[in-house]
Amino acid sequence: LLSSIEGQRPEVRVRPPFPVHGGLFRKPTVVNNVETVANLLFICSEGGEAYAAIGTPKSTGTKLVSLDSAFFTPGIFEADMGTPLDLVFKQLGSGFKRAVKAVHIGGPLGGLVPVSKIPDLTLDFESFAQNGFMMGHASVVSVPEEYPMIEYLEHLFSFTAHESCGKCFPCRLGSTRGKELLQKAQNDHNFKIDLKLMDHLLDTMKRGSLC
């Protein structure tokens, strides 16, 4: 975003320096999303300590959760950080209206959570990290029981390959290679993906890409 405003190639930046120290034109810059701005009224009226008292010690405040049409009550809901994820789905979303095998949380680069793991998670960054997931912006996309997971994974790799800014070669090349492997596995029934190769590819992308 900052590079685009400056007229440069829209590429991710190495941090530090963080925007608050050296952002737009290398000057201190505050970059906040609408969720952060929405919390300002409560913080200004009740005080920062009151807001920090909500949630968990490391994930304070509330979180906006977007539930898709697989729920009986879809929509955007605000919940305290630390709320059991199962409670969010059952009380706010009124549960699933069809069989679901996984939920994709936090956008394209977020985590695919099997339904069996939902009771283990709470709505905070630590819980997700400890279980190998990312909460991100907490959007929830449900994967129906009958939908082929390999097709969904191909969609994610295709998105990443298309949206990669190209700065980091593990992301630029790895996303395309992952997409090719998944496409071949679907088109050639005699081909099986080498899981060690796929794990190595994912680990390389994770370690070697800034995003």
Regions found by a protein language model. Name each.
Residues 1, 105, 109-114, 203-210:
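Short, surface-exposed loop/turn segments at secondary-structure boundaries that line and modulate
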Residues 1-6, 11-16, 42, 90, ...:
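Short acidic, glycine/serine/threonine-rich loops at helix termini
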Residues 1-81, 93-95:
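Hydrophobic alpha-helical positions that pack around
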Residues 12-15, 121-210:
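Ferredoxin-type iron-sulfur electron-transfer modules in oxidoreductases and energy-metabolism complexes
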Residues 49-62, 96-106, 167-170, 190-198:
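Flexible, glycine/charged-enriched surface loops at secondary-structure junctions
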Residues 68-70, 79-80, 91, 103-108, ...:
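Generic beta-strand/beta-sheet core signal
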Residues 80-87, 148:
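Short, structural beta-strand-to-alpha-helix junction motif
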Residues 95-131:
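Terminal amphipathic helices with adjacent charged low-complexity linkers/tails
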